[in-house]
Design a protein with these regions (language model features):
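Active-site-proximal helix/loop segments of hydrolytic enzymes
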Residues: 1-159
Length: 159
């Protein structure tokens, strides 16, 4: 995923790229709020199921959408999640239901940038290199579409 994004011209900050990183969700959210244009947390669901339930993103629960700071940002979180799911669908990746599951997360409740937690499957999912490449391709496609339509960056010539 990181190499593919770098190849597309993105700057990528991996807040947690090893097993020994001890940053909690609040710390990760604060870091991303200060240095990133968007925050995407990639996970494999540890649901204990004996089957692959597919990918989904954690959408903001209805009961939180009017609370601050969530009210100002949830629509962008949702747009990012939908874009990622659309990219995964284009690669024929299994999607759980609509692709969105309401979950109250620190990350989306306190993020001041577009932010999404995406579950790429679970312990029963295919974790082969081929499948991981398809997941990465779908995510990059979703990120590209989201950035094109939602993140406005001034052209270098105007700086």
């Amino acid at each position: 995923q990181k190499k593919k994004l770098l190849a597309e011209g993105y700057d990528v900050l991996m807040v947690r790229d090893g097993k020994d990183v001890q940053l909690d969700n609040v710390a990760r959210t604060v870091i991303c709020n200060n240095v990133a244009d968007c925050h995407i947390a990639l996970h494999w669901d540890s649901d204990g199921l004996s089957y692959d339930k597919g990918c989904f993103y954690a959408s903001v629960p209805e009961k939180l959408k009017k609370m601050r700071p969530v009210a100002s940002y949830w629509e962008e979180h949702d747009a990012l999640g939908k874009s990622l799911i659309k990219g995964l669908r284009s690669q024929k990746i299994k999607i759980n239901g609509t692709g969105a599951t309401e979950i109250d997360l620190t990350q989306t409740s306190y993020s001041t940038i577009p932010s999404v937690d995406i579950e790429l499957g679970n312990q029963c999912s295919d974790h082969s290199d081929r499948k991981l490449q398809k997941l990465a391709d779908g995510l990059v496609q979703g990120i590209n579409k989201y950035v094109k339509h939602h993140i406005h960056v001034a052209p270098l010539s105007s700086l």
